[in-house]
Amino acid sequence: MSQSLIVALDFPGKQDVEQFLRHFEGEELFVKVGMELFYKEGPAIITYLKEKGHKIFLDLKLHDIPNTVKSAMRSLASLDVDMVNVHAAGGSSMMKAAIEGLEEGKQEGKERPICIAVTQLTSTSEAMMKKEIGIEKTLEEAVAHYAKLTKESGLDGVVCSTLEVPKLREVCGNEFVTVTPGIRLASDDVNDQVRVATPKRARELGSSYIVVGRSITKAENPLEAYKTVKQQWEGVTV
């Protein structure tokens, strides 16, 4: 599970990122850059992190018409990021266009970034999905439907809750990538996410990657928290 622990850099700007990364001198991380940080700092934050030797999941959740998504992905691939995502609700044509854009934009001699789709946000409960989004399926059925569509569209995997991983293994196979946010240490608050799990539980359920934010970034000692999460996730002492 080398570098399958992704640290969410949910910070408002580069200064906060620099301060956080001082705890990890010499450590090559797999980090997630989301909307807040990317919209504030732009592509320069990607360049900065790459120069530090980190892998990057650029979490922008694209959802637009196919041609727009294709063009956007072409641009994102040129930044040499390692993972990107879209909303599965955008449909098959949009997801196929995303892959086309990534192939066209990837740097020479390198593989295209891993491309995954969001099924349902981990802040979404089944009651909310039915009442507000208008999907009458169970949450598990809706996620499985989107995951199957994602695989058929040529993407590498999905973002999903750990609770949905076993079902997705049945539907999409063991090679299908599952990236699971909503990971907390047992002692942490769950905050605004509904479907959460510990690193150990994510490992037991078969997640490919876990995304951990506050448990590490808000810790008194981020490096020690990182090591604790990594130990629980990988099942070994680090």
Swiss-Prot record:
Catalyzed reaction equations: orotidine 5'-phosphate + H(+) = UMP + CO2
Subunit details: Homodimer.
This protein's name: Orotidine 5'-phosphate decarboxylase
Role summary: Catalyzes the decarboxylation of orotidine 5'-monophosphate (OMP) to uridine 5'-monophosphate (UMP).
UniProt cross-references to Gene3D superfamilies, sorted A to Z: Aldolase class I (3.20.20.70)
Molecular function (Gene Ontology), one example: orotidine-5'-phosphate decarboxylase activity
PANTHER family attached to this UniProt entry: OROTIDINE 5'-PHOSPHATE DECARBOXYLASE (PTHR32119:SF2)
Domain of life: Bacteria
Entries under Pfam families matching the protein: OMPdecase (PF00215)
Pathway: Pyrimidine metabolism; UMP biosynthesis via de novo pathway; UMP from orotate: step 2/2
Any Gene Ontology CC annotation: cytosol
Active site: K61
InterPro entries cross-referenced by the UniProt entry: Aldolase_TIM, OMPdecase, OMPdecase_AS, OMPdecase_bac, OMPdeCOase_dom, RibuloseP-bd_barrel
GO biological process: 'de novo' pyrimidine nucleobase biosynthetic process; 'de novo' UMP biosynthetic process
Chain positions recorded as substrate binding sites: 10, 32, 59-68, 122, 184, 193, 213-214
Class of the enzyme per the UniProt entry, highest EC level: lyase
NCBIfam families the UniProt entry points to: PRK00230.1 (NF001273), pyrF (TIGR01740)
Coiled coil regions in record: none
Membership in a protein family: Belongs to the OMP decarboxylase family. Type 1 subfamily.
EC assignment: 4.1.1.23
Keywords from the UniProt entry: Decarboxylase, Lyase, Pyrimidine biosynthesis
